[in-house]
Amino acid sequence: MISNYEPLLLLVITCCVLLFNFTISSKTKIDIIFAVQTIVFIWFIFHFVHSAI
């Protein structure tokens, strides 16, 4: 279900990402991507294990 605020929220997130893309260094970008992928992987494993039990 799409709420009324979601398009605005997605627009704000997109603008922030574009702003940060030009302001932060490549090493910081790689560190952020690695951290996000790690969090998503841990979340996936957590839910997979709990659905299998």
UniProtKB/Swiss-Prot annotation:
Protein modification: Not phosphorylated.
Transmembrane residue ranges: 5-25, 30-50
Gene Ontology process terms (BP): DNA-templated transcription termination
Pfam family membership, one: DUF1029
Family of the protein in this entry: Belongs to the orthopoxvirus OPG141 protein family.
Annotated GO CC locations: membrane; viral envelope; virion membrane
Residue ranges that the UniProt entry lists as topological domain Intravirion: 1-4, 51-53
Subcellular location: Virion membrane
Annotated function: Protein probably involved in counteracting host defense, since it enhances virulence in vivo.
The name this protein goes by in its record: Virion membrane protein OPG141
Topology Virion surface: residue spans: 26-29
Source organism (scientific name): Vaccinia virus (strain Western Reserve) (VACV)
